[in-house]
Regions:
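Bacterial Sec-dependent N-terminal signal peptides
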Residues: 1-24
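Aromatic (Trp/Tyr/Phe) and Gly/Pro-enriched flexible surface segments
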Residues: 20-159, 163, 178, 189-242, ...
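Gram-negative outer-membrane beta-barrel proteins
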Residues: 170-174
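Short mixed-charge
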Residues: 176-185
């Protein structure tokens, strides 16, 4: 009986994805993409660069500020920038064919270079990233990158896991590059990781328009080595309440405030930091969900060039 009980415990400890009730994320199968053709400034060559956004299939021609449409929750690190009057497009997220026309999202850490004689000479490390939210274009500088995007969308459910397919490619070596757009790129010791997270928050706003949050649920994982091809139906468990005393807790799962705070639009229309001030009760109902998938896991403008994360079939599991 004790052996039978142990076997039952082992069998039920990890619930296979097919046993979960899956709610697909809008456009989380990455079958549809918005194609953006942006003509860069003549001082950069005047070429037309193509970048992509996740959403209904259509094409946008010209350097226009992009806003999500068609019910897509997704934003990406692909942006239209205009720095010192120079128009530039950056694309570190692209559609990728898994085979037979089955598209997925490919995120790659790249080095963007902007060089204009006597005016600009910028090198910027850009990890490929997709996330729930919106980026505010055009990007006009590399300062305070989190203030240029809104992280998270309204959401009140309590899923057990984020379910997705993935493939990871990590290049050989043990270094990262720091390139912020100011000064020469620097080589740092230690390799960057690819990362996926889902966080549930309960947010509120005070009379002055400040936004606060408590963490309701947390799922966060990093990938430090290449996978053996595609991993399908992978589950990232979401743990509820204060997890700091749990065996699976890692420092990078902690609260987001100060320099780590993300931003959101308050009721006055202003973009302000979301101050995550504590852990909520394990049975709390969230107001927002944050989902992010990236070829990097470090600070802004730091990464291992060539890190690549492929993802597909994103869903919440219940």
């Amino acid at each position: 009986m004790r052996l039978a009980g142990l076997l039952l415990l082992v069998m039920t400890a990890v619930v296979p994805a097919e046993a979960l009730r899956l709610e697909k994320v809008n456009y989380g199968d990455f079958s549809h993409w918005i194609t953006r053709h942006i003509k860069e400034s003549s001082v950069l060559g005047g070429n037309t660069k193509t970048i992509y956004a996740i959403g209904p299939s259509y094409t946008v021609n010209g350097a226009r500020a992009f806003k999500p449409s068609g019910g897509t929750p997704w934003a990406t690190s692909n942006v239209y920038a205009k720095v010192s009057g120079v128009t530039k497009a950056s694309g570190s997220v692209t559609p990728f064919d898994r085979g037979g026309g089955n598209k997925c999202a490919k995120m790659e850490t790249i080095m963007e270079k902007v060089k204009v004689a006597g005016l600009l000479n910028m090198n910027v490390v850009v990890p490929g990233t997709i996330y729930f939210g919106q980026v505010f274009e055009p990007i006009t500088s590399t300062k305070n990158p989190y203030a240029k995007m809104e992280m998270g969308i309204p959401y009140t459910k309590r899923p057990a896991a984020l379910v997705y397919d993935y493939k990871v490619v990590i290049p050989a070596g043990n270094t990262r590059t720091k390139a912020t757009g100011f000064g020469s790129p620097k080589t740092l010791q230690g390799r960057d990781d690819c990362e996926v997270y889902v966080m549930l928050q309960r947010r509120w706003e005070d009379a002055k328009g400040n936004i606060y949050a408590k963490r309701v649920g947390t799922g966060r994982e990093r990938f430090s080595r290449s996978s053996n091809g595609w991993v399908t139906g992978h589950q990232l468990p979401i743990h509820y309440g204060d997890i700091t005393g749990k065996s699976y807790y890692k420092p990078y799962m902690g609260l987001l405030d100060g320099s780590k705070a993300y931003y959101a639009r308050n009721s006055k229309g202003k973009i302000v930091p979301v101050h995550e001030i504590g852990w909520d009760s394990a049975d709390a109902t969230p107001t927002h969900v944050l989902v992010m998938m990236s070829s990097g896991s470090g600070e802004a403008y730091v990464g291992t060039v060539g890190n690549t994360l492929y993802v597909d079939n994103i869903a919440f599991g219940f």
